[in-house]
Amino acid sequence: MSSFAVRHDWSRQEVEALFALPMNDLLFRAHSIHREVFDPNEVQISRLLSIKTGACPEDCKYCPQSARYDTGLEKERLLEIEKVLTEARAAKDAGATRFCMGAAWRNPHERDMPYLTDMVKEVKSMGLETCMTLGMLSAHQANQLAEAGLDYYNHNLDTSPEFYGDIITTRTYQDRLDTLSNVRAAGMKVCSGGIVGMGEQATDRAGLLQQLANLEQHPDSVPINMLVKVTGTPLDSVDDLDPLEFVRTIAVARILMPLSRVRLSAGRENMSDELQAMCFFAGANSIFYGCKLLTTPNPEENDDMSLFRRLGLKPEQGKAAIVEEDAAVVARAAREQQAEGEAKTKPLFYDAAN
């Protein structure tokens, strides 16, 4: 019998009560649910590529890609498909099972849709799951991407409805919810989460997760981002969030959305190994892999695999993309895990069974 129920009617008071639990109680509850649903030692790996960088007309205060802020970012045109495919091949060789493509747009133009759908088809033909984040989508655009075979669409809610206006004024909260509805209606999977550490209050972190958990269907993937402060953006000097509050956010997300993948997303470059380990225990089971997330730093692949080996974690090897035996970094980590398990006479670390 399951120790949890999948709900869509969480009150703010209930969510805030979870945040207020003693840390040990919160982690125990979150990890128990996580272990019941997922392999607790398996982490899904995604690679994120910026296919069009900078010059975004929006005013999101956290974003270095906004044309409104002087961050020194050089804008780039939409990448050629062959360049995207080269990056996708490298991602697959490094162990990624999902390839995410992001463009700094308010919304895609109709003239770009044939190009984008061709891009999806080509990447998907490699055996990778595909994801895009292109801004707001109309119902028609969502259907076009779905027909091309796009698996996931990312569109974050960013924060609570109450704090949202302090961060963004060029797009409403309802605009974001409408895009998520269009994505779901088209038959694609939803990737939606938010950013913490933007100067919000604890009740705003609760409000963000409440909104996500009370969607008609929970997001399939929930990225939790720690703000990466970029010089030139309005949030470049905001106070740092207590790392333990970040862990609490991961844990509450796992409790509220037990069947979703919770992604430890932006900000990992500045997180200690110990903090990341706590997040994995709290229920995070997905990461972005590679040295860059759109325009901000991310841990090197070798660093991630070293951490995986030390924690006894293994990359997910799902139906979409099986890591080839000669994929250097992941294969080496898997062999080391397996060797350590054999040395202890018990299969403590590596188990390739799905």
UniProtKB/Swiss-Prot annotation:
One Pfam family in the UniProt entry: BATS
Chain positions recorded as [4Fe-4S] cluster binding sites: C56, C60, C63
Biological process per Gene Ontology, one example term: biotin biosynthetic process
Cofactors required: [4Fe-4S] cluster; [2Fe-2S] cluster
Pathway listed: Cofactor biosynthesis; biotin biosynthesis; biotin from 7,8-diaminononanoate: step 2/2
EC number: 2.8.1.6
Entry keywords, A to Z: 2Fe-2S, 4Fe-4S, Biotin biosynthesis, Iron, Iron-sulfur, Metal-binding, S-adenosyl-L-methionine, Transferase
Amino acids binding [2Fe-2S] cluster: C100, C131, C191, R263
Gene3D superfamilies membership: Aldolase class I
Gene Ontology MF, one: biotin synthase activity
Domain of life: Bacteria
Comment on bound cofactor: Binds 1 [4Fe-4S] cluster. The cluster is coordinated with 3 cysteines and an exchangeable S-adenosyl-L-methionine.
Domain (Radical SAM core) ranges: 41-268
Disulphide bridges: none
First-level EC class: transferase
Catalytic activity: (4R,5S)-dethiobiotin + (sulfur carrier)-SH + 2 reduced [2Fe-2S]-[ferredoxin] + 2 S-adenosyl-L-methionine = (sulfur carrier)-H + biotin + 2 5'-deoxyadenosine + 2 L-methionine + 2 oxidized [2Fe-2S]-[ferredoxin]
NCBIfam families linked to this entry: bioB
Subunit structure: Homodimer.
Protein task: Catalyzes the conversion of dethiobiotin (DTB) to biotin by the insertion of a sulfur atom into dethiobiotin via a radical-based mechanism.
Homology family: Belongs to the radical SAM superfamily. Biotin synthase family.
Name this protein carries in UniProt: Biotin synthase
Organism: Shewanella amazonensis (strain ATCC BAA-1098 / SB2B)
Protein's gene: bioB
